[in-house]
Amino acid sequence: MLEISSKTNLLEQKSYKYSLQDVAEPNLQRDVYSYGTIPKVAFNHRRVPMSMPEEIWITDTSLRDGQQSVEPYSVDQIVNIYKLLSKLGGPYGIIRQTEFFIYSKKDREAIEKCMALDLKFPEITSWIRATKEDFQLVHDLGIKETGILVSCSDYHIFKKMKMTRKQAMDYYLATVKEAFNAGVIPRCHLEDITRADFYGFVVPFVNELQRLSRDAGVPVKIRACDTMGYGVPYTE
């Protein structure tokens, strides 16, 4: 079927709709990611045209991901870093958002002190696991957007979560609905995407997220996380 593309305004073949490929055993892609050699790069010779957005900005993770590689920050350090991020980003919000942990009393105290500064940028967001209990913390703090950990490789789905692909997808979608119900914009962090079955899980999952977003009239953000650092900068 042909259709006018909303991206190119040209007549194109309608995109194929990928469906979830539920499997009994995990595909760990040992031919690519073996334990004995460096990861291999397979070429598919597909050119992906650049599509530059009208605006480019930074979403900062110094206060969340950054804390996982250094000694944990004190409340005063978090507040000072937040002030510096606002100053660096300027009045137009080049540094548009930043992420916070919310689990400890110290984390929540730091968020409350940063909120009290009433700075326009960077917007304070959080990062949580896909659980109802974590959403309650977000709601109680009055945060409008949160990152949600949605692991998408079979390594994580089968080995860490002890689920099948369908069970994981159903669980994630139910969690996103909880975000909608709480009045929170979900930002889905697709963990370990470079080791995931892209067309058998990632694309069908994102399609379902888009459907939920349309039905609810609430935006859903997607973050592609190259957790293991296996991504390459070229498209072919």
Predicted regions and their residues:
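N-terminal capping/small domains of soluble enzymes
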Residues: 2-132
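Alpha/beta enzyme core
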Residues: 23, 48, 53-58, 70-94, ...
